[in-house]
Amino acid sequence: MKKEIASHLLEIGAVFLQPNDPFTWSSGIKSPIYCDNRLTLSYPKVRQAIAAGLEELIKEHFSTVEVIAGTATAGIAHAAWVSDRMDLPMCYVRSKAKGHGKGNQIEGKAEKGQKVVVVEDLISTGGSAITCVEALREAGCEVLGIVSIFTYELESGKEKLEAANVASYSLSDYSALTEVAAEKGMIGQAETKKLQEWRKNPANEAWITA
């Protein structure tokens, strides 16, 4: 499953690998990888594979789920497809409450005591997913965990999720992606080394000259 999804993401250009010409994230971190899972929306076969995979993860790890919650905005469409497949209610959670109208942060119904699974497109530092989890907990929901399409497998993300006491499972990850990219001849040995060094410590730019 991990390598299959990784292959899909590479084929449609949802993930770019540029170890010799790094991207700069909004945080200022230089990165050899850029992930835009919104592109999956434009590929029916890919998004169907993702929805099926997320459903499988939820059934395996969070079988008592009652509500599917998407993170705004990238997780909303995937949450909708998964909730439809599972015949479950769905809501989505904003990064912060609206400044007008009812001032909702949670759109749709997620009631006190209900068991919720969060659908996220990408786990990097875990920040947006944790914000979603906290909003649902404040509303009295029991958050069973998070499922996502892809994770960078960053230690900082793992630590934040553990600190928030929330389980998280991804369809694919950085390790599988770099392995598939190497198998496809998209990166060579030198590039693979740079990618591996970056994941160990993204804040240390020594990987660029590794």
UniProtKB/Swiss-Prot annotation:
It catalyses: orotidine 5'-phosphate + diphosphate = orotate + 5-phospho-alpha-D-ribose 1-diphosphate. Pathway: Pyrimidine metabolism; UMP biosynthesis via de novo pathway; UMP from orotate: step 1/2. Orotate binds at residue 124. GO terms for biological process: 'de novo' UMP biosynthetic process; pyrimidine nucleobase biosynthetic process. Gene3D superfamilies: 3.40.50.2020. Keywords: Glycosyltransferase, Magnesium, Pyrimidine biosynthesis, Transferase. Belongs to the purine/pyrimidine phosphoribosyltransferase family. PyrE subfamily. PANTHER family: OROTATE PHOSPHORIBOSYLTRANSFERASE, URIDINE 5'-MONOPHOSPHATE SYNTHASE. Catalyzes the transfer of a ribosyl phosphate group from 5-phosphoribose 1-diphosphate to orotate, leading to the formation of orotidine monophosphate (OMP). This is Orotate phosphoribosyltransferase. The lineage of its organism: Bacteria, Bacillati, Bacillota, Bacilli, Bacillales.
